[in-house]
Amino acid sequence: MNQQERNICYNCFKEKPEGGGPCPCCGFDLEENAAKYPAALRAGTVLKGRYVIGRVLGQGGFGITYLAWEQSLEAKVAVKEYMPGEMAVRIGGLEVQPRSAARREDFAYGKERLQEEARILAKFMGQPNIAGVTDYFDENGTSYFVMDYVEGISFKTYIANAGGKVSTEEALNVMIPVLRALTAVHGEGLIHRDVTPDNIYITKDGNVKLLDFGSARYSLGDKSKSLDVILKVGYAPKEQYIRRGRQGPYTDVYSCAA
């Protein structure tokens, strides 16, 4: 289902005049966003009869994250789609399929990992420093999960805006909430594996959120992929550089210190 015929902006979701060009309210340019992410769902696509897909927030090796509009609550949310570009292709603008029969097993394995991550993250709805999962479902041959949409800036941007460094007090004000979030996550047996400044967000009201859990859960491990596709140089401990390195909560602690 698609709502492209409606004249709305797929960033601020406000009505806009007919015709192309950037939104007069927020300046968002849909054509530019679509050209940047050709493998993404078309803006205006409706998932599960309730989530109107908007602009692409980001794309990684294993999936695409969209801004979306939840129609019943009339609120912005973030929707993650399992779309591993190296092993999958989109058919007819919607359906996601493995590129070949040889990739079918790997595709299914990664899809299961996404579903597992969503189920675990759904347990953290009451944790103030984690963007909780509110829904997950299968559609278009792949899997999706819906998260709180966090408006703010990344800690990476915050540091850059501060001239490349922050005070000890500022660093502690950010990292202590991150450690609280990791304590809850580790208690459920999940390891983040990608604690970096660009995955830590400071919201408009000053709250701190740790995002993008389970990057390594998307890794296909012994099946075909090595962990180097998800580690970030300068933040990853040595066990993440080893194909079968033993990882645990200490992996995240190292990244926090780095």
What spans do the regions from the language model cover?
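AlphaC helix of the eukaryotic protein kinase fold
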Residues: 91-124
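Activation-segment/catalytic-loop signature of the eukaryotic protein kinase fold
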Residues: 136
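Conserved short submotifs of the Hanks-type protein kinase catalytic core
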Residues: 140-154
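AlphaC helix of the protein kinase catalytic domain
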Residues: 155-166
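Activation segment signature within eukaryotic-like protein kinase domains
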Residues: 174-175
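Protein kinase catalytic-loop region centered on the HRD/HxD motif
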Residues: 179-190
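Conserved activation segment of eukaryotic-like protein kinases, specifically the C-terminal portion
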Residues: 226-239
